[in-house]
């Protein structure tokens, strides 16, 4: 936020604008088609699409064959999901998992069924689908003292499956907490002793990015690259995965060309040079929320919303004066294009596009014969967001140091993911009912969990950079002061609520009154992307290294045939 500096020789006060020193966009016009080279379907693309359909039919036969044993079916489903293909076979997978659920206790609950991989994998697959399967099924792998049997250590694939299953725990499931501790320790030991073993790639990846906390495109890109190494791999699945990944990538490239052209026409680089220019990173973020081609409309809408949110965040956080920020907050509350001229000129460049994007979404939904009430919910969420932005700006102006509790009461909203959750429902079609928006507006566990994960993950990795300019204290500084502890202790303590937040999110997904899974997945996917972008550093603000590599692997480089 800009501050006033008094001068005895000049005017009564002058405005000193802050600068955060954000690096410029690293992408330039990379994704904007030049001349007549707009992404068009070629004969090669058409052949690939035909090949895709043929391969899909082969896999569908594998899923519907009546003579396949249950162990093989759950392994097949796991591979399909890891390879990013499950959206092609949703009905078949739902039917199969319902059969697994119906026979679960009879099949896996007996002491005779002691295959750890089968039990843990089926548990994870069912929990992922919202089936509240009891974790007591793992007690048969414990000794009389309640400890996991050491003989399990030799079953590396089983240990890996138990590790992944443990990340679907809810509060009070001590057996899964013990399982996580047990498997983490022994899988790390396995890696140290067998760094080049075939399973080492899977183990290494899981320890860093458990499946429950990973987003689809990154999981698929990695698994496709190593799947051929494993004795259980199926060539038809690998061929389908490569074909599908590359075709979906072309869909994303075409959309990103449209998005970057829209962004370039807004000319924020010249009109608002103090703000982060991260539209490509925003699109990448939103492909983590929904990557499937059928979600093109919500993907474009949410990308525009998050891109403009980033600009407006920087107006509050870096550039605007207290008086200007009050004006902007009031204008957003009124949501009226007729007051555009009352704003400072630089703010108009962000205010008008904001209103335009929501109006565009509303018009498109009306043309499709869909109700538009979701846009109103998203507007209200955006208004609440900017109120917290202003609250933090006032803290900075007053040089106020909030308690940790005060800070979190505001910062859980200013992290913007509550607004993004609402906005993620807007273009989802008829499944996003008024009841779903009402449920979301009451801050359910899954949204609060997401907010905690976002805010604390961001603050832990980003607070030192923010402290290089005038900025409010982060959760780290507030916790240090409130509890009289060191920075390292604060980090450790703040990671505990993040762990609990994931459990909250898992719990919400098992509630019968929760909205349909396609809606819950949007909220959960926001947390998954955050888990990647804020891993070790702020990969959104500082996107020129690891984030660049991730974007390149998902949105630029096709997978070789």
Swiss-Prot record:
It catalyses: (2E,6E)-farnesyl diphosphate + H2O = kunzeaol + diphosphate. Its cofactor is Mn(2+); Mg(2+). The Asp-Asp-Xaa-Xaa-Asp/Glu (DDXXD/E) motif is important for the catalytic activity, presumably through binding to Mg(2+). It is found in: Cytoplasm. Involved in the biosynthesis of kunzeaol. Produces mainly (-)-germacrene D along with gamma-cadinene. Belongs to the terpene synthase family. Tpsa subfamily. Binds 3 manganese or magnesium ions per subunit. A motif (DDXXD motif) lies at residues 313-317. Its EC number is 4.2.3.143. Pathway: Secondary metabolite biosynthesis; terpenoid biosynthesis. Mg(2+) 1 binds at residues 313, 317. One of its GO terms (molecular function) is terpene synthase activity. One of its GO terms (cellular component) is cytoplasm. It holds the Pfam family Terpene_synth_C. Its main location: cytoplasm. SUPFAM superfamilies: Terpenoid cyclases/Protein prenyltransferases, Terpenoid synthases. One of its GO terms (biological process) is diterpenoid biosynthetic process. It comes from Thapsia garganica. Keywords: Cytoplasm, Lyase, Magnesium, Manganese, Metal-binding. Disulfide bonds: none annotated. Mg(2+) 3 binds at residues 458, 466. The lineage of its organism: Eukaryota, Viridiplantae, Streptophyta, Embryophyta, Tracheophyta. Mg(2+) 2 binds at residues 313, 317. This is Sesquiterpene synthase 2. The gene is STS2. InterPro entries: Isoprenoid_synthase_dom_sf, Terpene_cyclase-like_1_C, Terpene_cyclase_plant_C1, Terpene_synth_N, Terpene_synth_N_sf, Terpene_synthase-like, Terpene_synthase_metal-bd, Terpenoid_cyclase/PrenylTrfase.
